[in-house]
Amino acid sequence: MGYCQGVSQVAVVLLMFPKEKEAFLALAQLLTSKNLPDTVDGQLPMGPHSRASQVAPETTSSKVDRGVSTVCGKPKVVGKIYGGRDAAAGQWPWQASLLYWGSHLCGAVLIDSCWLVSTTHCFLNKSQAPKNYQVLLGNIQLYHQTQHTQKMSVHRIITHPDFEKLHPFGSDIAMLQLHLPMNFTSYIVPVCLPSRDMQLPSNVSCWITGWGMLTEDHKRGPVHTAVPSRLQAVCCSGCRGQRVGSRVGRFRSMIVHSEGQLRSLMPGDFHLGDSGGPLVCYLPSAWVLVGLASWGLDCRHPAYPSIFTRVTYFINWIDEIMRLTPLSDPALAPHTCSPPKPLRAAGLPGPCAALVLPQTWLLLPLTLRAPWQTL
């Protein structure tokens, strides 16, 4: 098995949300749309050193980028996907569980044989030593490993240096480098990274996945099996300065900035414990990564949107990290064959978070104050 190598270029989609009036019109159109794809297909080339590719901006066909566009974003599973129901093995092969001392902490997303992305806030008040973290892929059940499971040690954790410098949860993105490259199989595949200037169609089908809590009873811990939820994203402009709620403490009002953040407009089931997990959209050729679950209000306040890190904003940073980070030494990779401990939702702060109901968020009272939390 070889050592982990960097990638020269990474690109992602530019996705922003519309002004109030435009949002209402676009939302009405989306709610009545029935032309959303509900199947995925495609063949999977194998190989431990294959790299995730970019999706071409001008087309939704399988345009080759560096000859590897047939690798990423194409699960083996073919069939309908139902929101809120357990995922099937191989259905979301880039979904990873980030383990902290053997317990599920956050979601993460495989973007290359040696790299995953997650969110910086997952590491707040936690040890920064990579030896305390592992990633689990090829698994849809956290308590039960199969022959498809790969559990890998983390070599390096790189959090964004500007996290919360400009506004709360700003630059909420982190990268994880593995000691050894992940072997791509029918159950472990990287997600595609779209090009910077690609425009998503208005009826694109987008999904969020994770093991987060499905109820407000946070004592129950995360669910055992990965659960997908459907989300329809609006691709427009004008997300600046939109107030989505209030935050207790030193920040009395929470403002969503277009710089590096997305907000959800559609109902779904993104909950506590899903932080760092993927928001992916399906094009005719493959699934592409659009956002990372960052934060939201708890289930008692459904009128507020959940917030995602807009990955496209960090394209240069991601590219630089993957190009310039030193290679890991495979001889130093620790043994990682032990089964995971029973999960206890490590470090999860309080009750669950849910996506906003689309028909209510545009009429939010600006004076309402509600508790905030990470997802």
From Swiss-Prot:
Molecular function GO labels: serine-type endopeptidase activity
GO biological process: proteolysis
InterPro entries hit by this protein: Peptidase_S1_PA (IPR009003), Peptidase_S1_PA_chymotrypsin (IPR043504), Peptidase_S1A (IPR001314), Trypsin_dom (IPR001254)
Residue intervals of the Peptidase S1 domain: 81-323
Keyword Disulfide bond: yes
SUPFAM superfamilies: Trypsin-like serine proteases
Bridged cysteine pairs (disulfide): 106-122, 206-281
First-level EC class: hydrolase
Pfam families xref list: Trypsin (PF00089)
Listed PANTHER family: PROTEASE, SERINE 47 (PTHR24253:SF42), TRANSMEMBRANE PROTEASE SERINE (PTHR24253)
Annotated protein name in UniProt: Putative serine protease 47
